Amino acid sequence: MDSSERKPLVTPDALSARIRRAWEGRISGCQLGKPVELLSMREGHEALTSYLASVDSLPLRDYVGYRTGAGVQPACCRGQLTRSEPDDDINYSVLALWLLERHGAQLTTADVARAWLNLLPAGATFTAERAAYRVLLEHADDRFPHGAEAGFDLSECSDNPYNDWIGAQIRADVYGWVCPGQPGLAAELARRDATLSHRDDGVYGAMFVAALGAALAGVTPGNALAHALEQIPAEAGVAQAVRLGAGLAHDVDGGAAIRAHYDGLSPVGTLNNLAIVVWALYSHLDDFSAAIGEAVAAGLDTDCNGATVGGLWGIQGDAIPTQWTAPWQGRVALGLAGHDEVTLAALVERTTRVALALADQGQGPSRRKKDLP
């Protein structure tokens, strides 16, 4: 790699600042998409666009406006936010942090399964995660949550009809944030988490998102995309989705083109949503509001895509506009057992500490051995 293509790997203070912006971006993007998530998934893009227009939220560059009778969640709408409301996307990010604090680079899929049983309410899981959870409850040894062996093959948990949907992808971001310049390690950590519930493209989507977050700390955005793609098979559907989204960057009709390309795919699929993420991010690398706004306005899984774009945009290091962060006041509500609310400051401090600990330990295992030099 030509040295002119590199950005300097971050100092501890700069790393902390990037991680803060990643959390700010992820939480803000999630809260932007959360009010219209069900509207988008159940009624489609036309209904989403009609609603946004009716509340003067197009182009989408601020939190969504609210009107009654539309099935929209008011707590996350413009003028209503007082904290980040609980959401599974943020639950999984905090759960990944909890796992890394305890296991670091030695994290295993069994560790993830135990954490689910101990901390993640079954009612807060959906599709592939709920199917995997059900298998754990039915087949795992009663002592498994407390450290015993599972007593069955954990790969049975991912044998479900949703294993190529978006669930694993939304669990992956933090693995990238704590591995700056190490996309291989980030992808491997995300893989170990993802394989509990997902297979094939469902896993590759998680690996790609984690790897991209890690690579953005070390190289320019264009090169980061290439390094993240190195972590997954070139022929995978995820790789094709990434190339589609990147190829449509700066095309104002990119969202429509992606929806048409994946017509018939579930609105919570991995491929269509990842293509939206890449398109929105790479169309607006210098404009946070436009990046998350276009990701959400494009439809499909709006809170997931807003969150993923927001976190990836933030990890680059540029400041998140205060119009997005001020309304939720550094308060992050959760739906994890024993964890009702946490502060942004605590998340930043804990995540930075994990990242520095991983750096002190060295690179650690990397499945594909393609971290940055």
PLM segments and residue spans:
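Structured, active/binding-site neighborhoods that engage oxygen-rich ligands
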Residues: 1-373
